[in-house]
A protein has these predicted regions:
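Small beta-barrel nucleic-acid-binding modules, primarily SNase/OB-fold domains
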Residues: 35, 40, 71-342
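Bacterial N-terminal signal peptides that target proteins for export
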Residues: 40-58
Length: 342
């Protein structure tokens, strides 16, 4: 139970002038200013990329990871120190706070008035099959956290336009006597959200993807809803009514096309009908800085996440390697790839 002043659970996520319950992802949204603004934000996020390394693991597995991996995962697994040595200035980015409520975006409202957005989480939306999916996820997280203290490490000094501060957050989960653990990882393990790539989640990327994969395999939380199933690149019906929403698509790249303006990963022979992934020219440099050769994706199975654009056939624009998982190293026994028809 939360403190006496906590709002009703059905009010999670409400802000003046906003009604989160009116949004329904199964209705195709306008492809106007809203969609363009979302794409602009994703492109801007690419500028924060600082580089990394392409690591091959085994004969049949390729993973995109960022060095130094061991150090990064240690940083992901530990809560930040909650104090400074005597005489040393306190770190303004590190702190602790009491959670008073959790909204439907899985953001944590603290007793001091701050609102934390947990880095690495893409919270669920209402779906045709479960209009309360977002509420149920927030209630579960609230059961863990409301009335409890969380440790956090802020990833930015100023809140965004929604008043949120991106942060890594840590707290005991389930048993208050248990050690504090990363809340993003715990939420993904329970299927309360999907992994969201970004600078703030980069150090924890491998651990967070593994947590998401476990929940997906066990059909926990949102993964029990068919709406959130990973879409096969060749399943055109799977893209229906999802334009402008965040999707995860998996398939084999049959060709890589380069032009003066973009590089396109092609998944099928019918241009304008089959799925494709677009990387704008300015973002190809980000892949190069990470040691990722886009041509190397040809013939490989990859998993891509991003906003779905249906204006010229199903496609997703990615801004950096964080948004792609390469899950095989080369072609399997399915036979040679088919070149696209022009």
């Amino acid at each position: 139970m939360g403190p006496p002043n906590a709002p009703p659970r059905r009010a999670f996520g409400w802000r003046p002038g906003q009604n989160a319950r009116t949004w329904r992802p199964h209705r195709e949204p306008s492809r106007g200013a809203g969609f363009d603004a979302a794409m602009t934000l994703r492109r801007a996020a690419a500028k924060a990329f600082t580089g990394g390394a392409l690591l091959r693991a085994g004969v049949g597995v390729l993973a995109l990871a960022y060095a130094p991996a061991a150090r990064a995962q240690e940083g992901c697994a530990r809560a930040p120190p909650l104090g400074a040595p005597a005489g040393a200035p306190a770190d303004p980015l590190v702190g602790t706070g009491r959670v008073t409520f959790v909204n439907e975006r899985l953001e944590l409202a603290l007793a001091d008035g701050r609102l934390l957005r947990i880095a690495g989480l893409d919270p669920p939306r209402p779906t045709p099959g479960d209009p309360d999916l977002d509420v149920n996820s927030s209630v579960k997280l609230a059961d863990w956290l409301v009335g409890e203290d969380v440790a956090f490490r802020l990833l930015e000094t100023r809140p965004d336009r929604g008043g949120r501060l991106a942060a890594e957050a840590f707290a005991p989960v389930g048993d208050p006597a248990s050690p504090a653990r990363p809340l993003a990882q715990a939420a993904l393990e329970a299927g309360l959200a999907r992994f969201e790539p970004g600078e703030g989640a980069r150090n924890c990327r491998a651990a967070l993807l593994a947590a998401e994969a476990g929940a997906r395999a066990a059909a926990l939380g949102l993964w029990a809803d068919p709406y959130y199933a990973v879409i096969a690149a060749g399943d055109h019906d799977g893209f229906a009514e999802k334009a402008g929403t965040s999707v995860i698509v998996e398939g084999r790249v049959i060709d890589v096309e380069r032009s003066a303006y973009r590089t396109t990963l092609i998944f099928g022979p019918r241009r304008g009908w089959d799925f494709s992934v677009t990387i704008l020219q300015r973002n190809t440099k980000i892949f190069g800085a990470a040691g990722v050769d886009l041509e190397s994706f040809k013939g490989r199975m990859i998993r891509v996440r991003g906003l779905l654009d249906m204006r010229f056939g199903p496609q997703v624009e990615v801004s950096g390697p964080d948004e792609i998982e390469a899950i095989t190293q080369a072609k399997d026994d399915a036979g040679p790839a088919t070149a696209p028809r022009r």
